[in-house]
């Protein structure tokens, strides 16, 4: 093989990435039309299609490379030269960071995730950090309130590319101004101007306007979820201006945004200012670049593990029957390994568990299911594993371990955001915090069900609490589609003795679920039971679940809000929410600074 072959292979990989990202942008660009046409099922299909594109194009490139090399063996020096040639193609390449991740994916597919060394892969980027200061097209546009905030917001909304009429633009502008005045006060608002992203961020049934409230000493998020009414008219549902609210909107438990980003790195840097608590991995994940987010997540792990003296330990909480979960005490992620053998009541295979995790990756997570990154042949230093955990790994997942002396290799694991297990949280809180947690738990189940997901095992231990107090589901081995479940009432006992029998007096088929039985484990705690009955008693009735099933089967797609319903303009300013009525801010026109 000649030296020219290395360049040909490098060019083939980069061209394959160009094709993949071109299709990625093509699918993304259809988001506006899907929104305008209210084609919500197409929204869901496009989300899955875009996720599958990456692996599909990696496979195409792998087949091309096998043809190019004609099945000849490739030694280490040859592979290093290919990477060197690829590196030389990247200095002027606009998406170099994701192109490196694509190279890694091709290599892993070719060599079955083995020999994953920094010499052969882009474990760390080969390129210096690039500030995106000169762009072929600006990412955002500035708006100044010289003629008042009403005029400014009118210009912002009129500049949107959406081709639908507004339900009542003047009313929505009044709502936004009132919300800004409540959040900032008139004097501070008078010192602000807006910077608004040129592209809308589409997700579920909303088109998000994402911007920045730029003040002399700080910058805040400015987020407007724009919805489409059943009559085909646009309206703004709320205005979010805090970092915590923005963090939830861009959260790890939500589906990826559809936002047209030819330069994703530049968009990530632009977003960082209003999402200071998000890591680089989380920002790439939010805009749909999930494979590069995996690369960045691994880099964040390496950065942490090389600078700490902690040891891996079993994660807090009740030990799972399917997954073995461990963590580093100060790290914000957990590592999940499928056990070799499951508890007897778990009649499933490892392949089934992996399929469930893939379902979650592709499905609308509605802010209630944690995203995961999947890794193969993950290497750990033994000195950084607590002896008790190492013994547990060897006992429970020994078939997935390869002992390399001072290191072990785990053939397959998931990395997921670390949360406080809900059962531990409920033990620690009282009063309003307890009430909020129970309300969140029930809301999580409702929203999952509305998205056609039945959690299966709804024990508190299978849910976690985020730093924002949201309850998120994270145990996926028993999930299924709502439409696959048969929700039944428990038949009345035939005789008084039936209720005392160890076996049910009625037949139970696969897929049967009896919501009345939820009460036994959800309401057993006297601190929790009355709260659950007060707020979520309908979850204990089979007819509630069947009604949801019917809505799903009839094609209804529920609205998903990344904020509390009490923040919706229709709730906050409900008396003035009629389409034919404009809204006047409480304090009238905002004063302009001199």
UniProtKB/Swiss-Prot annotation:
GO terms for molecular function: [isocitrate dehydrogenase (NADP+)] kinase activity; AMP binding; ATP binding; phosphoprotein phosphatase activity; protein serine/threonine kinase activity. It comes from Klebsiella pneumoniae subsp. pneumoniae (strain ATCC 700721 / MGH 78578). Its EC number is 2.7.11.5, 3.1.3.-. The keyword Ribonucleoprotein does not apply. Disulfide bonds: none annotated. The lineage of its organism: Bacteria, Pseudomonadati, Pseudomonadota, Gammaproteobacteria, Enterobacterales. One of its GO terms (biological process) is tricarboxylic acid cycle. The gene is aceK. Coiled coil: none annotated. It comes from the Bacteria. Bifunctional enzyme which can phosphorylate or dephosphorylate isocitrate dehydrogenase (IDH) on a specific serine residue. This is a regulatory mechanism which enables bacteria to bypass the Krebs cycle via the glyoxylate shunt in response to the source of carbon. When bacteria are grown on glucose, IDH is fully active and unphosphorylated, but when grown on acetate or ethanol, the activity of IDH declines drastically concomitant with its phosphorylation. This is Isocitrate dehydrogenase kinase/phosphatase. InterPro entries: AceK_kinase, AceK_regulatory, Isocitrate_DH_AceK. Belongs to the AceK family. It catalyses: L-seryl-[isocitrate dehydrogenase] + ATP = O-phospho-L-seryl-[isocitrate dehydrogenase] + ADP + H(+). The keyword Chaperone does not apply. HAMAP family: AceK. GO terms for cellular component: cytoplasm. The active site is at 371. It is found in: Cytoplasm. Keywords: ATP-binding, Cytoplasm, Glyoxylate bypass, Hydrolase, Kinase, Nucleotide-binding, Protein phosphatase, Serine/threonine-protein kinase, Transferase, Tricarboxylic acid cycle. ATP binds at residues 315-321, 336. Pfam families: AceK_kinase, AceK_regulatory.
């Amino acid at each position: 093989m000649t030296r020219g072959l290395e360049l040909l292979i490098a060019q083939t990989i980069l061209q394959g990435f160009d094709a993949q990202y071109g299709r990625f942008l093509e699918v993304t660009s259809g988001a506006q039309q899907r929104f305008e046409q209210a084609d919500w099922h197409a929204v869901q299909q496009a989300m899955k299609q875009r996720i599958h594109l990456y692996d599909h194009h990696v496979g195409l490139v792998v087949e091309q490379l096998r043809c190019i090399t004609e099945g000849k063996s490739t030694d280490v020096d040859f592979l290093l030269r290919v990477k060197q040639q690829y590196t030389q193609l990247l200095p002027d390449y606009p998406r170099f960071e994701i192109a490196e991740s694509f190279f890694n994916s091709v290599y892993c597919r070719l060599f079955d995730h083995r020999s994953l060394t920094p010499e052969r892969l882009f474990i760390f980027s080969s390129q210096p950090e690039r500030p995106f200061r000169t762009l072929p097209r600006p990412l955002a546009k500035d708006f100044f309130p010289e003629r008042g905030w009403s005029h400014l917001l009118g210009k912002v909304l009129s500049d949107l590319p959406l081709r639908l009429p507004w339900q009542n633009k003047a009313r929505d502008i009044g709502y936004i101004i009132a919300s800004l005045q409540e959040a900032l006060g008139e004097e501070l608002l008078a010192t602000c101007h807006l910077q608004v992203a040129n592209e809308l961020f589409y997700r579920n049934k909303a088109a998000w306007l994402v911007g920045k409230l730029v003040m002399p000493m700080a910058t805040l998020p400015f987020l407007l979820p724009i919805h489409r009414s059943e009559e085909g008219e646009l309206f703004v549902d709320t205005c979010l201006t805090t970092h915590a609210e923005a963090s939830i909107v861009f959260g790890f438990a939500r589906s990826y945004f559809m936002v047209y980003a030819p330069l994703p790195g530049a968009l990530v840097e632009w977003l960082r200012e209003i999402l200071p608590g998000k890591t680089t991995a989380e920002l790439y994940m939010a805009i749909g670049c999930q494979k590069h987010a995996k690369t960045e997540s691994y880099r964040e792990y390496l950065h942490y593990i090389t600078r700490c003296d902690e040891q891996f330990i079993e994660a807090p909480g009740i030990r799972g029957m399917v997954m073995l979960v461990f963590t580093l005490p100060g790290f914000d992620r957990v590592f999940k390994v499928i056990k070799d053998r499951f508890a007897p009541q778990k009649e499933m295979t490892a392949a089934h568990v992996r399929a469930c995790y893939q379902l979650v990756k592709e499905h609308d997570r509605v802010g209630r299911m944690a995203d995961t990154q999947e890794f193969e042949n993950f290497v750990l230093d033994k000195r950084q594993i607590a002896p008790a955990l190492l013994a547990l790994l060897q006992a429970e997942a020994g078939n997935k371990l390869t002992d390399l002396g001072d290191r072990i290799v785990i053939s397959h694991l998931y990395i997921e955001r670390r949360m406080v297990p809900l059962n531990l949280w409920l033990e620690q809180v009282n009063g309003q915090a307890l009430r909020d947690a129970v309300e969140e738990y029930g809301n999580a189940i409702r929203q999952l069900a509305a998205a056609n997901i039945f959690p299966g095992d709804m024990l508190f231990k299978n849910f976690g609490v985020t730093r924002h107090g949201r309850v998120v589901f994270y145990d996926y081995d028993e999930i299924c589609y709502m439409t696959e479940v048969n929700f039944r009432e428990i038949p009345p006992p035939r005789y008084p003795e039936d209720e005392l029998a160890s076996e049910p007096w009625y037949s139970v088929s696969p897929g049967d679920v009896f919501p009345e039985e939820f009460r036994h484990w959800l309401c057993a705690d006297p601190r929790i039971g009355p709260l659950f009955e007060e707020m979520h008693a309908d979850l204990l009735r089979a007819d509630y679940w069947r009604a949801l099933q019917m809505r799903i089967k009839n094609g209804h797609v529920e609205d998903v809000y990344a904020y509390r319903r009490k923040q919706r303009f229709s709730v906050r300013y409900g008396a003035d929410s009629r389409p034919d009525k404009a809204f006047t801010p409480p304090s009238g026109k905002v004063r302009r600074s001199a």
